[in-house]
Amino acid sequence: MDSGSSSSSSSSGSSSGSCSTSGSGSTSGSSTTSSSSSSSSSSSSSSSSSSKEYMPELPKQRKASCVVIDSESDSDNTSDEKNTTVCEISSGDETSDIDRPGGQKLPLIVIDDDDDGSPDLKNTKQKSDEPQMSVLEKEGVECIGSDSTSPHDVCEIWDVCGSSNQTSSELEPEGEPESEAKGEPESEAKGEPESEAKGEPESEAKGESESEAKGEMETEAKGESESEAKGEMETEAKGESESEAKGEMETEAKGEPESEAKGEMETEAKGEPESEAKGEMETEAKGESESEAKGEMETEAKGESESEAKGEMETEAKGEPESEAKGEMETEAKGEPESEAKGEPEPEAAKGEMETEAAMGEVETEAAMGEPEQEITAEEAKKKRAAYLLAQQRKRKRKNRFICMSSSKPRRKRRRADPQDGADPQDGADPQDRADPQDLADPQDRGDSQDMPSLPGTSDEPIPSGQPVCPRKGMASSRGRGRGRGRGRGRGRGRGRGRGRGAKAGK
């Protein structure tokens, strides 16, 4: 299609075919002027000879007379050259056609592929011109009384690029409307409207069809490269986000240190110019994976999985751990909205805050574990539990806002809640858990088990059914079951140890 379009578009730049209505002498003069003017492009003479070789049968095909477009209907500003005499060109009646069957007719149509150079392209373009004869014959044949050039009326066929080189300075304004009228349907049929629109002004300004062929190629190349670059960026961004979510799951399942997940999130948040909402989702997911990996390390070191739930709440609620350790409701209520406000516009800054506060929360949990039992009373436990419920509601609202992006998180937390539902009746039967410093998070876990069954109704509603959650679902389910068993065992061990310590402290 490119060869056809370039051939039709470049025909007038290289050749000004002119058939005159009066005898062979004037036609030979006009054809010599057309050939001399078309010799500005390097290979036009060779193409004229090749056109004689390859297409001597064109005059036979052109039995139909040319459809003539009146020059008044097309040209606006060349009022002096509007001789609206109508020339019908039929291939057998003129002496010029008999004298020069190949050379005279063919510059009208065939010498339009000079600038591309290679004869193979010429052959293909001339062959592609043969089925286009019906299109080309319907081009406007303007009969201009060109008194400045010859005393006879010269009929010139205007092609896509506009003016022929013979009278390019005079006739460019006439060539433009016709070329726009004709070039647009042809080039649209060939699928290159924008390249033709860009190529036209260039070729009219330069008088070269070469520039239009280059313009087409350049615009196509630019469009392809831009679309490829955008597509690559989008696919990379999507692949990164998916691989990041999968990487989170893997790091959580393996219990690797938080640094890997943190590196993934940071590089992705910096490398992706996608959106702040995605950044916020990343910070939430990152905080979750951090706290989970951290929680696993703590369960291995201390045998307690409650610190993991506390770590999640630390990273996402920012300031709740301190208030939990100290029992301050006001700072906690302030910390949560601040974190929510900061997390949206500044995911990077929120990430740093989450890391620092997570570290502070660890230190405080350790300090709280070392504290004697008498400091933590049942009232403080109730306050903390109420605060945790409030934080859970806020987090759920936030998640529902971005549920389309972080669609695997609610499923992950729902599965995380399932084993806790089985283990939480033991917490209710255990009277010492409220006051035990090591089991600070047990009342929160009870709050978790009370909250989470309401999650499926709220979280599954906004999720569209066609989201790519299905591959993550299997991974999350297997990982949730495995982690749930490990967490149950860890909590049992931690509780046993906590009871021992609590009994000693009580004594």
Swiss-Prot record:
Its main location: nucleus. Keywords: Chromosome, Nucleus. Residues 480-507 have a biased composition (Basic residues). Interacts (via SIM domains) with SUMO2; this interaction allows the GCNA recruitment to DPCs sites. Interacts with TOP2A; this interaction allows the resolution of topoisomerase II (TOP2A) DNA-protein cross-links. Belongs to the serine-aspartate repeat-containing protein (SDr) family. A motif (SUMO interaction motif 1 (SIM)) lies at residues 12-15, 66-69, 86-89, 108-111. This is Germ cell nuclear acidic protein. GO terms for biological process: DNA damage response; DNA integrity checkpoint signaling; homologous chromosome pairing at meiosis; homologous recombination; meiotic chromosome condensation; protein-DNA covalent cross-linking repair. One of its GO terms (cellular component) is PML body. Disruption phenotype: Mutant male mice are sterile and spermatocytes exhibit DNA damage, crossover defects, and chromatin condensation abnormalities. Germ-cells specific. The gene is Gcna. Residues 1-51 have a biased composition (Low complexity). It is found in: Chromosome; Nucleus, PML body; Nucleus. May play a role in DNA-protein cross-links (DPCs) clearance through a SUMO-dependent recruitment to sites of DPCs, ensuring the genomic stability by protecting germ cells and early embryos from various sources of damage. Can resolve the topoisomerase II (TOP2A) DPCs. Residues 122-141, 179-354, 431-449 have a biased composition (Basic and acidic residues). It comes from Mus musculus (Mouse). SUMO interaction motif 1 (SIM) mediates the binding to polysumoylated substrates. Residues 1-507 are annotated as: Disordered.
